[in-house]
Amino acid sequence: MKRVFASFLLLVAPLAVFGQQSSQDEAEKLRQQLKEIEKRLQKVEKQAAQDRIRFGGDYRFEAHSIAATIPDYYDGMALQAGLVNTMFYYGATGQLPTSPAAVQQFIASHYGDYLYFTNSLTFDQLKSAMASFPPQMQQQLMMMLLPGAYRHGYDADNSLMYTNRLRLTMDADVAENVTFSGRLAMYKTWGDSTAVQVFNGQANSFSIDGNTVGVPNSDILRVERAYFTWNNIAGLPLYLSIGRRPSTGGPPMNLRKGELRGGTPMGSLIDFQFDGITVGYHLGEHSTLRFCYGRGYESGFGNGEVLKQPADRLEDADFFGINWDVYSDDNTLLQTTVARAFNITDGFNGLIVLPANPLTGQPVNAPVVMRFTPSANLGDMDIAGVLLKRKDGPFDWFLNVNYVKSHPDPVTTPFGGLFSDPFEVPKSHSGSMWYLGGRYTFNNDHTMVGLEYNHGSKYWFNFTPAQDDIFAPKTAARGDVAEAYLIHQLAKRFFVRLGVINYQYDYSGSSWHLGAPKKLDSKPILGFPTYDDATVVTLSMTARF
């Protein structure tokens, strides 16, 4: 029996081993097949994802050389400090001082009282005190303080500055008739990623929601655009688009950059990152009418409004406008933009380093980063413009005329009111701007040369803090600006650009709706120094992908 059993084992054992080996082979074969299927699925999913989202972008290096001058002026902050100090002296002694030195001696001997006075001072108290002085006394006071506030003009050059800009674009077909578009952007100067500049009176030294990637800021990649568009609503040529809008780089500003139209509104009126809604209707193959809404300041979140009584809270700042491509095809664009901004505030939420207290005029000795929150609604502002842009063979050209009108409330703050100084009663003013340019393309479309010129009047103002100019938005100038440039394609999607811009400012306050414009050759009183002329040479190299 044992022999039979042993023989059986000898017979079965190889079969068992063979069967086990066969099972392992099958399992291994199955695993290989699963891996192959998994790879195919991953490839399909990757392809599907790539089909859903299309990525692109560009990187730009720029080198800038700036030669600028500041004209003779009276330092408004120093003058403000002198007024406040004199108020303290007058309140304690009942008489005007004989000299600024007498005020300083009095402050030194009563410094504790002086600190209490300046810390508790309000702008309304300051205005009331100034209004209580008879004109003769005001003149006497100014004659005493002005000499100490005088500043000789000086150069404000920057021989060489470099910047990096990275933009990543994405588009997706979400569903039938629904699309998504977005753009992330980073823009910085070499050697700085602080994201906050020391305020120097220029609009590009104040970081707000409207210009976070429009002026050099930091190495932070920010959301410049993110919006969906719902087309063919109810079977009509009607669409709805909501989100952070494509509101920068609009025509004709794209021409001088050698780019396609980058934004919807006219770029010489609105070049401002904002969140909003557009309802559009295609009137025909070559005409689109758009109704646009946006919010520039949200009062009810993040500003401590709950801590205030309802009567003391600010209104939201909104705008509503019409943007009509009257006719648009490959060779012609006739466009008009009309808009009103409601309840404009004395600035927008942002981060800032203030060198001086705008109420007391006293210097802020430490570079303190602070959140700036508006303190008042100042009124409404109307803007309107017409643009004709043409392509005739190798020559592109455009004509553009714009208009602005203020509707102020009788409100001022330490920064002023709509087109008025802090101690004035604001009045309605209007301004205008005209702009023309041309570009010639040759060398088998590899090279372009262009010339542009624009002029802004005394009360000209537009919403262009994100305009792609390193020195200042050129279309915001209250004066004359001339630009010449050359763009050459070095390789496919690789470009070099050399540009020169000359600014000749006539009035102060370009880019600002606050403060009264002042003739710059009249030794004006300025809250902050401003340029009267500047020349900017810029070399750019851009890789698009």
Whereabouts are the PLM-identified features?
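N-terminal secretory signal peptides that target proteins for export/translocation
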Residues: 1-2
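N-terminal periplasmic/intermembrane-space "pro-region" immediately following the signal or transit peptide
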Residues: 5-11, 18-158, 169, 545
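Outer-membrane beta-barrel pore domains
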Residues: 21-25, 67-68, 151-155, 336-545
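Short, solvent-exposed beta-strand-terminating loops
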Residues: 60-81, 182-195, 343-348, 454, ...
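Flexible, surface-exposed loop regions and adjacent strand-edge segments
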Residues: 72-78, 196-203, 256-262, 297, ...
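Intrinsically disordered, low-complexity acidic Ser/Thr-rich regulatory segments
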Residues: 114-165, 207-218, 367-377, 420-426, ...
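Outer membrane beta-barrel
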Residues: 156-301, 320-334, 430-465
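Outer-membrane beta-barrel signature, preferentially recognizing the C-terminal barrel domain
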Residues: 271-276, 318-319, 323-325, 472-487
